[in-house]
Curated annotation (Swiss-Prot):
Belongs to the orthohepadnavirus protein X family. This is Protein X. Residues 68-117 are annotated as: Mitochondrial targeting sequence. The lineage of its organism: Viruses, Riboviria, Pararnavirae, Artverviricota, Revtraviricetes. The keyword Transcription regulation applies. It comes from Hepatitis B virus genotype B2 subtype adw (isolate China/patient4/1996). It comes from the Viruses. Residues 28-48 are annotated as: Disordered. Multifunctional protein that plays a role in silencing host antiviral defenses and promoting viral transcription. Does not seem to be essential for HBV infection. May be directly involved in development of cirrhosis and liver cancer (hepatocellular carcinoma). Most of cytosolic activities involve modulation of cytosolic calcium. The effect on apoptosis is controversial depending on the cell types in which the studies have been conducted. May induce apoptosis by localizing in mitochondria and causing loss of mitochondrial membrane potential. The keyword Transcription regulation applies. Its main location: host cell. The gene is X.
Length: 154
């Protein structure tokens, strides 16, 4: 089973939250209103949090209400330039799970600018967003030895 995440924008805090879609939801969006978002400083994720769920390839932090560490990012209201996307984020995140070198933060930033926010801009959103990816996840993966699919496009 590939990991699936959904995006929720909190305009009050200028934060885009990525959340894993639970195995029990079978691909449907997470229940609850879009306005229900975690506090600005979420508590630390317990090491066994979400271990009972069967999403192969996700680190345990993926089941936090704040979303997986590697995909948490904040946004600013101005984006100076539009950068061409690099279409290999799934491969990059797979390499991260294996401990291999991956894209720079700048490349990941470009990917999200073009692929996540493109639709909003094409629909006439006036707010332009710049993405900052936070790295350094301290959580262990729940899968082994099968290949890990940390993220797949829909």
């Amino acid at each position: 089973m590939a990991a699936r995440v959904c995006c929720q924008l909190d305009p009050a805090r200028d934060v885009l939250c990525l959340r894993p879609v639970g195995a029990e939801s079978r691909g449907r969006p997470l229940p609850g209103p879009l306005g229900t978002l975690p506090p600005a400083s979420p508590p630390a994720v317990p090491t066994d949090h979400g271990a009972h769920l069967s999403l192969r390839g996700l680190p345990v932090c993926a089941f936090s209400s704040a979303g997986p560490c590697a995909l948490r990012f904040t946004s600013a209201r101005r984006m100076e330039t539009t950068v061409n996307a690099h279409g290999n984020l799934p491969k990059v995140l797979h390499k991260r799970t294996l401990g291999l070198s991956a894209m720079s933060t700048t490349d990941l930033e470009a990917y999200f600018k073009d692929c996540v926010f493109n639709e909003w801009e094409e629909l006439g959103e006036e707010i332009r967003l710049k993405v900052f990816v936070l790295g350094g996840c301290r959580h262990k993966l729940v899968c082994s030895p099968a290949p890990c699919n940390f993220f797949t496009s829909a």
